[in-house]
A protein has these predicted regions:
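Active-site mouth of glycoside hydrolases
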Residues: 1-220, 224-230, 234-249, 261
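Carboxylate/His-rich catalytic cores and anion/metal-binding grooves
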Residues: 232, 243-278
Length: 279
């Protein structure tokens, strides 16, 4: 891609009646980058020029601060051998949060040489999403070992440090041999899915709390960067629990999984004209 193609694409969007574009630039900016958190400068320049052309054509932006499973890091998130999962580890690893901050801040607070503005302060930026499809993070299979400490803290607060109350509530779901909070193991995803016992309820309440807290964290960071518009997250899940996680969002964004491009984002790719019902 180059400036000419970026300008032509922006003009084509306007010609076809679009007035807003959603963009998730992390993978593209890290392609060919030299180190974690350091963008490919040619691609960053092209992104800023693209924003300029979109603005010229009256097109607003909805921005995904992060979408890749490895964020603003070197590597290929689509590689099946890639074991990093930032959508999960962002809840427990400060290094992942720092990676999110470094990349997001560069995009939003760097003065665009073509528009002369910081995107965070430009009315062109209409909406922001903290992390695309973050629901995948706390729905991954397996045991959530890294969250065990926060899980125990949550249970201590809920049951007011009275292990007897937890034991009575969990009944036969209390792991064998466990006699106090600090001996509780990490929970497994399957223990909280499609179950109605109190331990399952506690697991889901805990996950909802983590997701709500993450939304608050995203909002604080965006505000600190100078963005004053609507912030949201959890734009994929459609369960009742997901609705609770979005309760304090400024708006609801919801992905619809139909009419995918025939050849991903490559030139000549086509989109079906069928409806979501038709597909």
């Amino acid at each position: 891609s180059n400036h000419e193609e970026a300008a032509a694409f922006a003009a084509k969007l306007r010609q076809n009646g679009y007035n807003m574009l959603r963009i998730s630039p992390d993978r593209d900016l890290m392609h060919g980058a030299k180190a974690d958190g350091e963008f490919n400068e040619k691609r960053l320049d092209l992104l800023f020029y693209y924003f300029y052309e979109l603005k010229k054509n009256g097109i607003y932006i909805e921005f995904d601060a992060m979408a890749s499973g490895i964020g603003y890091s070197i590597g290929d998130s689509w590689n099946p051998r890639e074991k990093r999962n930032f959508k999960y580890s962002i809840y427990s690893d400060d290094k992942v949060k720092k990676n999110w901050l470094i990349g997001t801040k560069k995009i939003l607070t760097t003065v665009n040489p073509y528009t002369g503005t910081k995107l965070a302060e430009d009315p062109q930026l209409a909406l922001v999403i903290g992390y695309n499809e973050l629901e995948f993070g706390l729905s991954k299979p397996g045991t959530y070992t890294e969250l065990r400490g926060e899980w125990i803290k949550f249970l201590k607060r809920k049951y007011r440090n009275d292990f007897k109350k937890l034991s009575e509530a969990w009944k036969d779901k209390l792991p064998e041999g466990v006699e106090d909070f600090d001996a509780l193991p990490a929970f497994n995803r399957d223990e909280g899915i499609n179950k109605l016992d109190q331990r399952a309820r506690d697991i889901n309440e805990f996950i909802t709390k983590l997701e709500r807290d993450m939304l608050k964290w995203f909002k604080r960071q965006f505000r600190a960067m100078g963005f004053e518009g609507p912030v949201t997250n959890f734009n994929m899940g459609k369960s009742m629990r997901n609705i609770l996680s979005r309760k304090n969002a400024d708006y609801v964004a919801m992905n619809n999984y139909h009419a995918h491009p025939s050849n991903f984002i490559d030139m000549g790719s086509r989109i079906s004209q069928k409806s979501s019902v038709g597909e």
